[in-house]
Curated annotation (Swiss-Prot):
Keywords: Antibiotic biosynthesis, Glycosyltransferase, Transferase. In contrast to KanF enzyme in S.kanamyceticus, can only accept UDP-N-acetyl-alpha-D-glucosamine and not UDP-alpha-D-glucose. Its EC number is 2.4.1.283. The lineage of its organism: Bacteria, Bacillati, Bacillota, Bacilli, Bacillales. This is 2-deoxystreptamine N-acetyl-D-glucosaminyltransferase. GO terms for biological process: antibiotic biosynthetic process.
Length: 389
């Protein structure tokens, strides 16, 4: 699962444990049951309308988002009015289809709409191709309309909240609730069997870690280019990519062109329970995203005590202080990022300073008990009360 999906999973499970009944509509994949009961009050429905056998460099499968939208609308029409829902919660990430589905559900079911904007199309998102650029203004207008129709709209940082407050005539419905750290990262033991195996495999070599979806917005091409510069300067390094995505083949081609095949490992998608293992065995976490609304993996890295380099746009600049709790550079600044990475990997005092300063700040703000009750308060508000049981 990607970072947003991990955050949604953790949130829905926590809410279910607090007594909130939920039906979650997701894409799913072929071979997985259409309905999964994850908790007594938490049911996940795979609602994809169809799966086409054509690859997409952006979404993985052609018409994946549209397929989910059609399936979600069908499910809402067939099942929505059978259940006495109190609210509709849509998680949006710069893609138009969840926004349209949320507006349809709000009109059809006549229930309050709660919108969480994991990536703002208006302020954060950067179009990835010519078609994306062509529809950019339209999707921004849909995002704005969704916010105006919503009962409450959630953004992930105070900075983004300020941006929307300046844009909207009525900003009273806007609020900021951050991502948070999964409980598995708080209780992880480096003596676990997988950590022991990983330690043996790494042979004591310094490791630079990339954690995320292999897609344009995560800056994987910058990561490989930085790896090339570091390998030329330091030599005996390993680069681990935890994740998969629609541009994996392109990444592998760039790695081959840089003659780095023997220093790279791409794990593919891994269970989130193993993410802590990789973080605890890395000497540097590098996430050079082109746009990043928050960056859940960044706070996970901070908890694990890994020095961090990311970009100074969106969430990373809101979470961290450059030079104190993380290093933040411009997107695509290969030489600048490589220079900072070299300092961290060759100077223990630089790495230790970043480690010591980042973890306390993250712990004070992004633990589950600091974050999730804010959503429960939204659900329990007078206009959108959710009944337990």
């Amino acid at each position: 699962m990607g970072g947003m999906q991990v955050q949604i999973t953790n949130l829905t499970e926590w809410l279910a444990d607090q007594g909130v009944r939920q039906d979650v509509l997701t894409t799913g994949i072929p071979g997985i049951p259409r309905t999964l009961q994850l908790r007594d009050r938490l049911t996940v429905h795979s609602v994809r309308f169809m799966t086409l056998p054509f690859k997409s460099s952006q979404t993985g499968t052609v018409f994946l988002d549209q397929s989910w939208f059609m399936g979600a609308v069908k499910w809402i029409v067939l099942n929505g009015k059978k259940n006495n829902y109190d609210a509709i919660h849509v998680h949006a990430s710069g893609v138009v289809w969840p926004l349209l589905a949320g507006m349809f559900a709000q009109k059809y079911l006549k229930k309050p709409l709660i919108l969480t904007i994991h990536c703002s199309r208006i302020f954060t998102y950067k179009p990835m191709n010519k078609w994306d650029q062509f529809v950019h203004d339209f999707v921004k207008s849909v995002e704005l309309k969704s916010i105006k129709l919503s009962h409450k709209a959630v953004v992930l940082t105070d900075k983004r909240l300020d941006s929307y407050n300046r844009l909207l005539e009525d900003s009273s419905k806007m609020t900021a609730i951050s991502d948070c750290i999964g409980s598995n990262h708080l209780s992880h033991s480096i003596d676990c069997p997988f950590c022991s195996r990983l330690k043996t495999e790494l042979l004591g070599k310094k490791t630079v870690l990339f954690l995320g979806r292999i897609a344009h917005e995560k800056g994987w091409s910058t990561f490989v280019s930085v790896a090339k510069e570091l390998a030329d300067k330091i030599g005996d390094l390993q680069f681990i990519v935890c994740g998969d995505g629609p541009q994996r083949e392109a990444m592998e081609e760039q790695i081959k062109a840089a003659n780095l095949q023997n220093q790279f490992r791409i794990t593919g998608f891994i269970s989130h329970k193993f993410v802590s293992c990789y973080l605890h065995h890395a000497q540097l976490f590098l996430l050079p995203s082109h746009h990043e609304e928050f960056g859940g993996s960044l706070i996970e890295a901070a908890i694990a005590g890994v020095p961090i380099i990311s970009t100074n746009n969106g969430g990373p600049a809101d979470i961290f202080t450059h030079g104190e709790t993380a290093i933040l550079k411009d997107p695509g600044d290969v030489s600048g990022i490589a220079d900072e990475a070299y300092k961290i990997l060759t100077n223990d005092s630089v790495a230790e300073s970043l480690r010591l300063h980042s973890r306390p700040e993250v712990v004070s703000k992004f633990l589950p008990h600091c974050v999730y009750p804010n959503y429960l308060n939204l659900y329990s508000s007078k206009e959108a009360a959710v009944h337990e049981g």
